[in-house]
Curated annotation (Swiss-Prot):
Parts of the chain that traverse the membrane: 38-58, 95-115, 134-154, 199-219, 220-240
Stated role: Key component of the proton channel; it plays a direct role in the translocation of protons across the membrane.
Subunit structure: F-type ATPases have 2 components, CF(1) - the catalytic core - and CF(0) - the membrane proton channel. CF(1) has five subunits: alpha(3), beta(3), gamma(1), delta(1), epsilon(1). CF(0) has four main subunits: a, b, b' and c.
Name of protein: ATP synthase subunit a, chloroplastic
Natural source organism: Jasminum nudiflorum (Winter jasmine)
PROSITE patterns recorded: ATPASE_A
Bilayer topology term: Multi-pass membrane protein
Gene Ontology cellular component list: chloroplast thylakoid membrane; plasma membrane; proton-transporting ATP synthase complex
Amino acid sequence: MNVLSCSINTLKGLYDISGVEVGQHFYWQIGDFQVHGQVLITSWVVIAILLGSATLAVRNPQTIPTGGQNFFEYVLEFIRDMSKTQIGEEYGPWVPFIGTMFLFIFVSNWSGALLPWKIIQLPHGELAAPTNDINTTVALALLTSVAYFYAGLTKRGLSYFGKYIQPTPILLPINILEDFTKPLSLSFRLFGNILADELVVVVLVSLVPSVVPIPVMFLGLFTSGIQALIFATLAAAYIGESMEGHH
């Protein structure tokens, strides 16, 4: 009976943890609108980290880069190569967009594991990685959708919409549906992976607080980086596809 009681208490504790992480949110009331305060706070922190790091790295640029400048130049080369591979020779104007997406998602994902969000107490809910919230991932996916529609229209004009009846007009509904499922798949993939990673770490910390969570956290950091790379790569691929006019 004691074992059963302990098991029930443990499950209740895990349920409470999950409820706090997923179900409760902190809002700001601005007029008649409710603004999701948790996401804005953590997003501003991530943006500040990116801007601060970039400023420190390039405040005294050298002809032969060292330290932070060398690291940021390596990251820029990586993003340029990825953009060129997915978009083609006209990748140049899209490097800032793809780079911003990659760096924001990468730092957001890592912030969930490395920054002590939990020590900041809110009236409701808890702070976590921005990408832990579906609002952030959907917004990023919608930005990607706007980007590839813009790329297609500026490159091909109104003939861009001809792709919806290729190779046959019968496929018009499916081709339209495809453009709606692209942002959905991007947003839910990123949201699900980051949320699941943070919940697993929280549960393991509550059960075995000293040893087991450490390798899981390292695995989470690895998968978080992979998710940022996947999102940025697919965003670049969609932009390249819209400019080329084929699937």
